[in-house]
C-alpha cells in the first residue's frame, strides 16, 4: 500500500549515486531495516506492486510518478531532475494543495448559500454518482422541514446495504444526539441497516464517537469539508482546470546516449 511505497522511496534515496537497482537489492535493504518480512518471493511481489500502484495513483491525480522501472531495475524519477526543479516542483505542489483547500472552502460556502431544495439536489446527485441505488424520499414523524430524508442501497463489501440518509439543509452542526436519533429511527427507512448524515456544517467530536460505537448500526458522517471533497472527486458542482509542466523525456535521452536514437 501507500506505506510500503513510501518506505521504498525512502530506501531508494541511498542508491541515487549508482542509479536504478535490481528489485532484489531493494528488497534486501527493506528486510535489513525491518520494513518487510515473510517469504522473499511474495515480499518482492508486494514491493513491486506497491510501487506500481503508487505510480498509478500519481498518474490518476495528474502528478509525476515517483518510481521509474527500466530493464528490471527501479529508481526514483527524482533522479531525473536537478535540485532547482525538485525544489520548484515541491513549491508548485504545495501551492496547488493550498489552492485546492481554498476552493473547497469556497465550494462549501456556495452550497450553504443555496436554498434548501438546491442543497438537496446537489447531495442527491452526489449520492447517485457515488453509487447509491434506488434513492427514494421517505417521511419520519417529527422530522424537521430542514431535513431531506431518503432511503437507498449503498455499496457493501458483498451486496448493497439498505441505508437511511438524513440530509441537513440548514447548515447546522451534527452532534451525538443526531446520531442516536437516526439509529433509533432506522425502522422508518424501510429495511435500512445503516445510516448517513450529511450536513454543510460541522460534525462534532461527540457525533464521531457515537458513530464509531462498537456493536451499533453503522452511521457515516459527512460534514461540509467532506462534502466539498466528494464533490471535487466526483466532478459535482466544480469545473476542473489543469496546469501542465514539462519534464525531460528519460527514455529519449537514454536512447540518444546509447546511440539508439535513430
Model-derived features: where do they sit?
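A positively charged, amphipathic N-terminal helix/segment that binds anionic biomolecules
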Residues: 1-2
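Mixed-charge (Asp/Glu-Lys/Arg
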Residues: 6-60, 66-262
